[in-house]
Structure formats: C-alpha cells, structure tokens
Regions:
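Non-catalytic alpha/beta scaffold blocks inside enzyme catalytic domains
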Residues: 1-23, 27, 36-42, 49-57, ...
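Conserved hydrophobic/aromatic pocket- or pore-lining residues that grip, position, or stack substrates
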Residues: 33
C-alpha cells in the first residue's frame, strides 16, 4: 500500500536478488513493481532495474580471439571441477561442444572475489576447493586478502588505482559523464606489481613471440596514450591526453538531458515487451 501510494517511488535492485534459488522470479517481481505503480518515466521514479547513467565510453585493451570455444555458465564452475567430463550440452548447457572433455584443474581469478562468497553454497564450495586432487591450482590477483584469496595457492598482489596512472570513466553518475586521470599519490609498497607487468612477465616466460604479441612493444604508459588517442579519434570533443592529465577530471552533461527507461512506451504508449 505504501509503495502504491508513494509518488514518486524509486524502485531499483542490486545484483543480489537473483543469486539464489529461483532468484530470476524475484528479479522480475521487483521490475514489475514500478510498472504496476506508475513509477516508470517520471521524475524520481525508475524502471525497477539498476539505474542508467550517461557515460563517456573508454577504449579498452584489445583482446585476441580465444581459441577455446567451449563455454559453461559462470554458475556451474564448481560442477565442472567435480564432474567436468560428465557435463553435457543438453543437461548442463555446455556450449561449443556436446560435452566437456576434462574438469577444471586451474583457476585464474583477477579482482573477482567470486570463488566463495558469491556462490550459492559456501560450505559445498569450500569442501570442493579443499580437495587439491580436483582443482589443483588457484591463482588470485587482488589488493586485499579477500575470501577468495584465502583459497589461493598463489597470491599476486596488484597495485591500487592510487599507485599508478590510468584513465577511468564514471560508474553510476546520473546525467553527467566524466573521466578521471588517475595519478599516483603514493609509491607502490612492498613487492606489489601492476597487472600489466604481471601479465607481461607471464607472456615473456611463454616465449618471445607471445610476449611481443601481448605487449605489441608498448609499456603501460604507452598503451594508455595509444588507447586514449583512439578515444579522441572517435570523440573529437575530448581534451588531449596531456590536457586531461593536467585537468585531472573532465566532465560532460548528457546532451539529451536525461535518460528515460522504456521511453517509447512512456511517450507514445507503446507496450513494454
């Protein structure tokens, strides 16, 4: 009754409701509330999903084609450890093959912290990872001793964002996008290294051809300049690299004013599908 009578009522959901048994129904129910109560497309309302935002798109590191085409859902990786060769396309949703040939024996987890506390059954997952005859090696790269890092055979400590140069966009900032040119405010401590250095060293040990293919002969700073130059080529309104570095923060308002979810349905009463 309170939700139905409140105007506006801002209704949104995070990333938790669907992470449980039949959680997709919970997610759908939350999304239905603003539709039923007339809170879609009004000031202060929302669509029931995560809020939208205007952002300045950044250029990310190019990825080579993955030669491995077989895929499983992100939720079934524990099954792939325990009974990988038994998993099939029909029963378990394996993609790219009729069945898995081998179980998961190695996990590389970068800044994820999803090994334990974002899975459905912590105790079951704990027991699976305790058996080193199953998943034999876990590598975790992070800034903190997370729950996932505690299960790692090898922990590689990454640098924090305040310890290295980078360009990052806004996350959820509403109707104004921005770029921040990060500059170190403190020197790296102890033996921690940036992820690009870590991956470059791994590539180097796989062979000089792999190292060259991965780095393309660029340092981390050279990659940053190269990727930003591609951004400027697509968006000439952006300041130059050196100007952005001097500014620190570049802001831009949404040229359309604001984003309206299901705009066609709200303005011309088209049905929401």
């Amino acid at each position: 009754r309170e939700i139905g009578s409140a105007k506006p009522a801002y209704i949104c959901q995070g990333w938790g409701p669907q992470r449980q048994a039949n959680g997709e129904q919970t997610s759908r129910a939350i999304a239905m509330l603003p539709i039923l109560t007339g809170n879609v497309g009004i000031n202060g309302g929302n669509s029931g999903a995560r809020e939208s935002t205007y952002t300045i798109t950044i250029e990310r590191m190019p990825l080579p084609e993955n030669p491995v085409k077989t895929q499983i859902s992100c939720f079934s990786w524990t099954d792939a450890i325990v009974r990988g060769p038994e998993m099939t396309a029909l029963r378990d949703g394996v993609r790219g093959k009729d069945k898995l040939d081998v179980p998961i024996k190695f996990i590389w987890n970068y800044a994820g912290n999803t090994i334990i506390n974002q899975h459905s059954d912590i105790n079951k997952t704990h027991d699976i990872l305790q058996d080193e005859s199953k998943c034999e090696t876990i590598v975790v790269i992070d800034n903190f001793m997370t729950s996932s890092a505690k299960y790692a055979d090898i922990v590689l400590p990454d640098l924090m964002t305040v310890e290295q140069e980078d360009i990052i966009p806004n996350d959820y900032a509403g109707n104004m996008g921005y770029l921040i040119f990060l500059q170190p405010v403190t020197a790296p401590k102890f033996e921690r290294k940036p992820i690009y250095w870590i991956m470059s060293e791994v590539a180097k040990r796989l062979g000089p051809d792999i190292h060259q293919k991965f780095t393309e002969g660029r340092t981390q700073e050279q990659w940053l300049r190269y990727l930003y130059a591609k951004m400027v080529a697509k968006d000439p309104l952006l300041p130059s690299y050196d100007a952005l570095k001097k500014m620190g923060i570049y802001k831009r308002k949404d040229p359309n004013g604001h984003f309206v979810a299901y705009k066609n349905s709200v303005t011309i009463r088209m049905p929401i599908r």
